[in-house]
């Protein structure tokens, strides 16, 4: 975070758009709004990433999931420009998806954790999966780490 803060302080920026891996708390009424919550990435668990940035910058800071930020970027500047309904899926250390429906980012009680959808394994597949929460969800079976 120190390197990120120093980088942005060395530039004349007017706002920041923070697309963050999760799970994150997007509920503006929650006491942990802006936190990375119960992530398997132990060094980031319960980290107030938005509050840390706000403590260093007195500018507008947008906050959403990394995949929603990517979906919005594609709909604004990229291959989905001008399209109102967009689904952006990424496969890496996890599996994530961001979505726009009628031009609006999808949110709910939490953000959609599409990588944690349960899928049926082949009966002969004995791999237990790597997701620390569900083991054999989509992310646990098909992410880069799996």
Regions found by a protein language model. Give the residues of each.
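N-terminal phosphate-binding loop and adjacent alpha-helix
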Residues: 1-12
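A broad structural signal for short, well-ordered beta-strand segments within beta-sheet-rich domains
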Residues: 13-15, 135
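Glycine-rich phosphate-binding loop and adjoining helix at the ATP-binding site
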Residues: 15-16, 22-85, 124
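Short glycine-rich anion-binding loops that position phosphate/pyrophosphate groups of nucleotides
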Residues: 21-24, 92-94
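Glycine/GP-enriched mid-protein hinge/lid loop-to-helix segment characteristic of carbohydrate kinases
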Residues: 56, 62, 77-146
């Amino acid at each position: 975070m120190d390197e990120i803060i120093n980088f942005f302080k060395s530039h004349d920026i007017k706002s920041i758009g923070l697309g963050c891996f999760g799970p994150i708390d997007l509920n503006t009424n929650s006491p942990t709004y802006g936190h990375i919550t119960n992530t398997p990435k132990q060094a980031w668990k319960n980290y107030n990433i938005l509050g840390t940035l706000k403590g260093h910058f007195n500018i507008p800071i947008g906050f959403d999931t990394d995949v929603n930020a990517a979906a919005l970027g594609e709909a604004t500047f990229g291959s989905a420009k001008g399209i109102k309904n967009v689904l952006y899926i990424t496969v890496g250390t996890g599996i994530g998806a961001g979505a726009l429906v009628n031009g609006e980012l999808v949110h709910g009680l939490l953000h959609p954790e599409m990588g944690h959808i349960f899928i049926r394994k082949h009966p002969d597949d004995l791999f237990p999966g790597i997701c620390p929460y569900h083991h054999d969800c989509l992310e646990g079976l098909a992410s880069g780490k799996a």
